[in-house]
């Protein structure tokens, strides 16, 4: 986003918060397309396309200029006058541009609030691994958890209203509203039966994440307000992302839901040990409170979604569980709080006692069965975990085939470096290693035994040291602590995208 600062300073329309003129600027679409190509090192094959060019952007801008009014053909979307026959290509281009433009107010407010400081820390907190140290420090002292499935789809007008707090330009909002309804007619992102937006990350990921985050930000703002009002809690400033108008609206909504004075109802939610974490399409609310308090939270959330967002939120989407007896899937890990029992012998005069100490510990395990299912879906093995060859890679060079399998092993070792027990990764490495050998043997029309015998020990060594290669990104091989760190949990702050093999849900 740093590239656009110079353009924004030259554009006087930004002084008044007008974003609509940026839609007609070619560099916006070029920057948006380049920004969408950025991928994490965990992605195996970044998708690069050459469909975005200045010629296409010029043609799109010309059509926007020449179109006096937007005509939507609900029954014959293939002959749309605005996008023409290349509607899919134009929709991808304009969605990237719109998402990039609407992000500008968020970015400007972030930069102004940070004052050029703390940006590196903010980027580190974007890591997928960043919540895990927080969970380790806090979840071991809590006992109750609300497992929440965030409801969707959402009505189109609610999405526009959510963005209205950030985008003050009415013209941009009108264009967004038109674009949402146009997608509704195309039946790509929106169900034709209902004028509601169904979040689908498979297409237009940038626009999807922008809309989804604005939608969830509206929902999560009430947690900050309740946290701020509680006298027992420390308040962390999130003024960059939230406006005061949010809190007053949620305050009135809370009064309507409980039909009583707000301050009289607030005491139900005062809890000094409440924590909230969101991941993918789920969120968890963990507390040390009683079951009565957790049921009140559940009732409030159900009523809040139904009253404020106007959608049916079934109570069955909120599950109340006890942490010591509950395991939940969190970012590709199977997480739980387990008790570690240790016997201590105590001697008092002539009497000896055995004391059983139970210590709670946040545990993160590799979900072996779902991960094998992901490998089977990617055609590395069958459903039973038996390795198979990868026929579509037999046309590649031997070095390319080995590098592809090795990168997958390294990425999995990198991602699951925080696992409490890493023995499950040995099974995954074995599957990938043997799948690589079968792929190479199939290419050379040989048996696996004969091929491994001719290849030597270097082939095995590269896969066995893939985890050490990942750890060496942080710790030097010559460091005396490297051998000890190798067996402990490590959380990285550079993992921004989740690997496809770990995203098994």
Swiss-Prot record:
Where is it chiefly localized?
A: plastid
- Where would you find this protein in the cell? Plastid, Chloroplast
Gene Ontology CC terms = chloroplast
Q: Which Gene Ontology BP terms does the record give? A: mRNA processing; RNA splicing; tRNA processing
Q: Which domain of life is it from?
A: Eukaryota
Q: Which UniProt keywords apply?
A: Chloroplast, mRNA processing, Plastid, RNA-binding, tRNA processing
Keyword field contains Magnesium: no
User: What GO MF terms are annotated?
Assistant: RNA binding
> Among its keywords, does the record have ATP-binding?
no
Q: What does this protein do?
A: Usually encoded in the trnK tRNA gene intron. Probably assists in splicing its own and other chloroplast group II introns.
PANTHER family on file: MATURASE K
- Recorded family membership: Belongs to the intron maturase 2 family. MatK subfamily.
Protein name per Swiss-Prot or TrEMBL: Maturase K
Task: Please name the source species.
Answer: Coffea arabica (Arabian coffee)
């Amino acid at each position: 986003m740093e590239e656009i600062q110079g353009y924004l300073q030259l554009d006087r329309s930004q002084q008044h918060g007008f974003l609509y003129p940026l839609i007609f600027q070619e560099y916006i679409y070029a920057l948006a397309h380049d920004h969408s190509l950025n991928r994490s090192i965990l992605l195996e094959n970044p998708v690069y396309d050459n469909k975005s060019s200045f010629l296409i952007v010029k043609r799109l801008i010309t059509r926007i200029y020449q179109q006096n009014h937007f005509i939507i053909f609900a029954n014959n979307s293939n002959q749309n006058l605005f996008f023409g026959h290349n509607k899919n290509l134009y929709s991808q281009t304009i969605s990237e541009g719109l998402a990039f433009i609407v992000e500008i107010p968020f970015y400007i407010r972030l930069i102004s609030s940070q004052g050029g400081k703390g940006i590196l820390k903010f980027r580190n907190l974007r890591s997928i691994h960043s919540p895990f140290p927080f969970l380790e420090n806090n979840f071991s002292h809590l006992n109750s958890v609300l497992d929440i499935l965030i409801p969707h789809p959402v009505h189109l007008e609610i999405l526009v209203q959510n963005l209205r707090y950030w985008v003050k330009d009415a013209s941009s909002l009108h264009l967004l509203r038109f674009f949402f309804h146009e997608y509704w007619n195309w039946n790509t992102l929106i169900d034709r039966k209902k004028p509601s937006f169904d979040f689908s990350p498979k297409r237009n990921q940038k626009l999807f994440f922008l809309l989804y985050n604005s939608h969830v930000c509206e929902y999560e703002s009430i947690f900050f307000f309740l946290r701020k009002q509680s006298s027992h809690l420390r308040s962390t400033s999130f003024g960059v992302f939230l406006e005061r108008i949010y809190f007053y609206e949620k305050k009135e909504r809370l009064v309507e839901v409980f039909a009583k004075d707000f301050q009289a109802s607030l005491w139900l939610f005062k809890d000094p040990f409440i924590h909230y974490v969101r991941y993918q399409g789920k969120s968890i609310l963990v507390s040390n409170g009683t079951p009565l308090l957790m049921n009140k939270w559940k009732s409030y959330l159900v009523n809040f979604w139904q009253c404020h967002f106007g959608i049916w939120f079934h109570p069955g989407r909120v599950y109340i569980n006890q942490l010591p007896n509950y395991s939940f899937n969190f970012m590709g890990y199977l997480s739980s709080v387990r008790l570690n029992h240790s016997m201590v012998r105590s001697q008092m005069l002539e009497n000896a006692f055995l004391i059983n100490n139970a210590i709670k510990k946040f545990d993160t395990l590799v979900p072996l069965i779902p991960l094998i299912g992901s490998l089977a879906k990617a055609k590395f093995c069958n459903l039973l975990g038996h390795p198979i060859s990868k026929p579509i890679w037999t046309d590649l060079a031997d070095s390319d085939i080995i590098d592809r399998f090795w990168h997958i092993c390294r990425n999995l070792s990198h991602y699951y470096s925080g696992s409490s027990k890493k023995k499950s990764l040995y099974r995954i490495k074995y599957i990938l290693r043997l799948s690589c050998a079968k792929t190479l043997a199939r290419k050379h029309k040989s048996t696996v035994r004969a091929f491994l015998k001719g290849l030597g020990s270097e082939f095995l060594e590269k896969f066995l040291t893939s985890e050490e290669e990942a750890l060496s990104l942080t710790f030097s091989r010559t460091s005396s602590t490297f051998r000890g760190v190798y067996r402990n949990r490590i959380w990285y702050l550079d993992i921004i995208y989740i690997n496809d093999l770990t995203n098994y849900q």
